[in-house]
Amino acid sequence: LIEIPQIGFDAQSLTGTVQTGLGMYARGIARALEKKRELISLELLWPKDRKPFSATGERILWEMFNLPSKAKAAKSDLIHLPCFGVPRLTSIPRVVTAHDLIILKHPDMMPPGSRWYFSYWIPQSYRSADHIIAVSDCTKNDLVEYLNIKPEKITVVHHGIDQSFFNVPAVENIASVKDRYGIFERFFMMVGSFERRKNVELAIDAFSILAKDHEEVQLVLVGSSSEYRERMIEKANDYGLEDRIIFTGYLQDRDVATLYSICTAFLFPSSHEGFGLPLLEAMAAGAPVIASDIRVLKEIGGDAPCYVQEGKIEALMGSMERMLVDENIREECRVRGRSRAELFSWDDAADKTIEVYMNVLGMRGFDGIPARVT
């Protein structure tokens, strides 16, 4: 009799209506894992009322006590933590996904109220896990360098990409999105949370220079409200560009994919990333990409983006202007980007993740070989 392993999946990052990059990873990998029913049985372990945590204390209470209790009740053979904290008061094997170590490298980039959780609790969680899935080679290297975790305890599994981003949007959807936000024919765009490391301010500064000679172009910034976002709105107003720098707020995937597919170029000038999912989405949708020349974006983007020196306004502005005036460069970037994006899939990520599960559980393979015989 073959017994399929029972995997308890921490679903806290799937709560709420606004999905961050971490939530999008959790959603993508969970959907792909659920399709592997011949290999594993995946059960989503939800917090009470399926609501996001409003305080760090709630999160720790969930990770320390409530999650292990739910996993035990579900008879989980293994717990997968797709984001952050690892429960320690349990004998059930634990696999955690590590996205980045930005808080350890740059603690000033985190809100003071959550620094303890990310600078102490999370490193301890990584050390206590049975195995770590790193979303990039860069994150793996950081885990080894900053936390002295043995390389053999870490497996790199890149994100996948939702196949909907490869679809050509309907003409009526393009018109609808443009009309809704007052978007012109030519525009640059950014997607993501409004944080200093994303270098939104740098993009606004670069655009303010470009805008003087190119009145027909806009900058579209997609992302949820935050205090930093409000400061960026003020900055756009100070430049007198409130009509040409568009803050859309949070958008659903369909509208984001539509904008990717028609933008002049997608900007990703981040100073720090763990993976950079918007980069992958933009390439899949056919957007020419301008990205900062940091290691992780080169790992994910390959030869597809136009790379610029991180933190340099003139370099970013110059690349934006070249994209604006040279259709050949844009087309080359589009072709390379879509080809690169095709190398990433959630199905492949799920297979590699299951391989980690099997290794942690002391099992071997799944091509017709019993996972466990009882």
PLM-predicted stretches and their roles:
Residues 1-374:
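Carbohydrate transferase catalytic cores enriched for Leloir-type hexosyltransferases
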